[in-house]
Amino acid sequence: MKIKIINRSHHPLPAYATSASAGMDLRASIEEPITLLPLERRLIPTGLFIELPVGYEAQIRPRSGLALRHGITLVNSPGTIDADYRGEIGIIMINLSNTPFTIADGERICQLVIARHEQAEWVLTDELADTERGAGGFGHTGKE
C-alpha cells in the first residue's frame, strides 16, 4: 500500500524495523529538548502529515521500551488518525514515573500502525441474543 506523506522534520521517514513488523517508529520533531515532569503530559510534534485511503486508520501506540524503562506512554492509546485528517501528527505523551524524562529531537517516541476498519450501521432493537456470558463483565470470566 502506498500512502502520501509530507515530512517537515529533518528525520528519515518512518520505516518498519523488520519484514514482520506491524508498526513504524515515529520521531519527535522539536527545536529543543522537552522535559516531562512526573505526571506531566505534552503534545509532541512529529513534522509528519499523511493522506490515508478511505477505509484505513493510523493507530498511534506506545513504545514498550519507553514504557518499561522510563514509565513514558501515551495518554490516549491507541490514538486514531482518521483518513480525512490532514494536520500534523502530534503525540500526547505522559510521564507516569517519579523522575523527569527528557525527549530529544529525533527520539523514537511511539509506533504507527496502519489498519483497515469498517463503519458500522446501527440496527435499533429491543433485545439482544442470549450468550453463555450474558451481561457479565469487568473480570466476570475468571481470575486465573
From Swiss-Prot:
Superkingdom, taxonomy of origin: Bacteria
Keywords, alphabetical: Hydrolase, Magnesium, Metal-binding, Nucleotide metabolism
Swiss-Prot/TrEMBL catalytic activity: dUTP + H2O = dUMP + diphosphate + H(+)
Coiled coil: none
Positions with a binding annotation for substrate: 63-65, 76, 80-82
UniProt keyword annotation of Metal-binding present: yes
Cofactor(s) in the UniProt record: Mg(2+)
Annotated GO biological process: dUMP biosynthetic process; dUTP catabolic process
Pathway recorded for this protein: Pyrimidine metabolism; dUMP biosynthesis; dUMP from dCTP (dUTP route): step 2/2
GO molecular function: dUTP diphosphatase activity; magnesium ion binding
Gene3D superfamilies registered for this protein in UniProt: 2.70.40.10
Aminoacyl-tRNA synthetase as UniProt keyword: no
InterPro entries in the record: dUTPase, dUTPase-like, dUTPase-like_sf, dUTPase_trimeric
SUPFAM superfamilies (alphabetical): dUTPase-like (SSF51283)
Functional note: This enzyme is involved in nucleotide metabolism: it produces dUMP, the immediate precursor of thymidine nucleotides and it decreases the intracellular concentration of dUTP so that uracil cannot be incorporated into DNA.
Family under the similarity heading: Belongs to the dUTPase family.
Entry protein name: Deoxyuridine 5'-triphosphate nucleotidohydrolase
Gene: dut
